[in-house]
Amino acid sequence: MDKFTSLTGVAAPLKITNVDTDMLIPKQYLKTIKRTGLGSGLFAELRYREDGSENPDFVLNKPAYRKASILVAGDNFGCGSSREHAPWALLDFGIRCVIATSFADIFYNNCFKNGILPIVVSPEELEKLMDDAERGANATLSIDLDAQEIRGPDGGRIRFEIDPFRKHCLLNGLDDIGLTLEKGVHIDAHEQKIEGRRSWL
């Protein structure tokens, strides 16, 4: 998993509440267990028309937001089923941070496991960030994970909270496998100890 220390990028405003995982990545894209290639299916029912052409009115299809790496969204983001394809699709598209007033628990946890930073802010702070994001090409936000700050284009700063363990994992690029490998020396020592006691294994 790639480390997340800081991020400066275009923020796309998604003024939709209760964005569920089916909206994030529709069921027809769930046939794969690969984490790559899902970016094209992100928000597919909103991004594409019935004939397969792009919907020019959807925010991520607008020229200013095609390279967005931050998503500023509405309340209860990521609700619905537990499909891990949802954060996979966000990551494959290039989204590394989602800012909202609340997240569904399973989606929130899955974000951390896949190197995405979900940030919870107050309604007032979200309104300010939405205004910043609507500046289009100038909609650049900076995220400093170590300082736990969002910095706007006007120099304003918003502090956010994050669990220390999750912060440690993101800063060091540690997913579940990485956390296990951190204990590799202890695991090897345990295996050798067990092998000596249970030679028949």
Swiss-Prot record:
Ordered alphabetically, the record's keywords are: Amino-acid biosynthesis, Branched-chain amino acid biosynthesis, Leucine biosynthesis, Lyase
Q: What EC number(s) has UniProt assigned to this enzyme?
A: 4.2.1.33
Tell me a GO cellular component.
Answer: 3-isopropylmalate dehydratase complex
Q: Does the keyword Cell cycle apply?
A: no
List GO BP terms, alphabetically.
Answer: L-leucine biosynthetic process
- The source's superkingdom equals Bacteria
| InterPro entries in the cross-refs | 3-IsopropMal_deHydase_ssu, Aconitase/3IPM_dehydase_swvl, AconitaseA/IPMdHydase_ssu_swvl, IPMI_Swivel, LeuD
Tagged with keyword ATP-binding: no
What pathway does the annotation place this protein in? Amino-acid biosynthesis; L-leucine biosynthesis; L-leucine from 3-methyl-2-oxobutanoate: step 2/4
**GO molecular function ontology, one term from the record:** 3-isopropylmalate dehydratase activity
CDD domains per the UniProt record, alphabetical: IPMI_Swivel
What reaction does this enzyme carry out catalytically? (2R,3S)-3-isopropylmalate = (2S)-2-isopropylmalate
Q: What does this protein do?
A: Catalyzes the isomerization between 2-isopropylmalate and 3-isopropylmalate, via the formation of 2-isopropylmaleate.
Binding partners and assembly = Heterodimer of LeuC and LeuD.
What family name appears in the similarity comment? Belongs to the LeuD family. LeuD type 1 subfamily.
Q: NCBIfam families recorded for this chain?
A: leuD, PRK01641.1
Under which name does UniProt file this protein?
3-isopropylmalate dehydratase small subunit
Gene for this chain: leuD
